[in-house]
């Protein structure tokens, strides 16, 4: 994917997102091939993420001016949305309209006049809250019913700060969790600096285990092992299980560069693991609604059935985690989503089946949306939305 300007690159990336691609991967790959100054790279990033985070609102603003938007070529629809995004951000007409008209001329010359007319006629328009937040109606209403309001979702439409977990001494601005820092420069070879990009809410899931030197810890659904890295840095003997061998191999390479040792084992975790431990972390696969800031396209790909479907899998995985937890041990369940079904719903169903487990208090060092058997993290301020539950096995009842 090659493009001559940040605007052209943004359109190209968004077209690939339309085809099912992931914005973060596509944009990172495109920027690696573009020898632009940081200002241009930052502007392309703003355009891609801004358009996806505000997509429903942008279409709402354009709707009175486009009676049949679905009849337009996808390139032109994205050009109009990106022009509307710049209008929404207060960019003046003289700096905003002409560049997008030129983009249209290069692709569809016959539609350049339409682009010019529409972008010059944009005007404020009241929008329902779910549209203003660019959330699907079904999820917006579910969150309103569960949390009481959806104001927290504005956090998903803010710029995403880059947090790193440090595995050596650094001179960076501290994040909200000890060991987490804010990275304010361009992306780089982080592991060479002893750093690992990781949201503080993700790091806190590993901290909940309170792993000590020499303790054996099982990291289930560990992926590349980001949480395992932190546990290993505490001196724990970490065994990280996942079904994706390729991600594990990439994680093992990163761990070596960070000077850490993690044992990786590849297995389907709907089946029991062949060992037990006093400390078990299950960071289960989920709908990912807490990561809408970093993965804004995800909100438009989920269906109302997805939370219940994922909850059924998560309950299966919790059964595996329970069998692997020794008496007196701790099982931490975490998901990077804010749905009732995948958080409180899963833990409630699990505890009904397993009276040998008791929930323990969880006190994150950042604001929470709701408390119950576990806690939901407020995604404002750069945090990912997470749910955590800390479960103690008080006896060996099966």
From Swiss-Prot:
It is found in: Cytoplasm. The keyword Oxidoreductase does not apply. Its EC number is 2.1.1.176. InterPro entries: MeTrfase_RsmB-F_NOP2_cat, MeTrfase_RsmB-F_NOP2_dom, NusB-like_sf, NusB_RsmB_TIM44, RCMT, SAM-dependent_MTases_sf. Keywords: Cytoplasm, Methyltransferase, RNA-binding, rRNA processing, S-adenosyl-L-methionine, Transferase. It catalyses: cytidine(967) in 16S rRNA + S-adenosyl-L-methionine = 5-methylcytidine(967) in 16S rRNA + S-adenosyl-L-homocysteine + H(+). One of its GO terms (biological process) is RNA methylation. GO terms for cellular component: cytoplasm. CDD domains: AdoMet_MTases. The active site is at residue 336. The keyword Transferase applies. One of its GO terms (molecular function) is RNA methyltransferase activity. S-adenosyl-L-methionine binds at residues 221-227, 242, 268, 283. Belongs to the class I-like SAM-binding methyltransferase superfamily. RsmB/NOP family. Specifically methylates the cytosine at position 967 (m5C967) of 16S rRNA. This is Ribosomal RNA small subunit methyltransferase B.
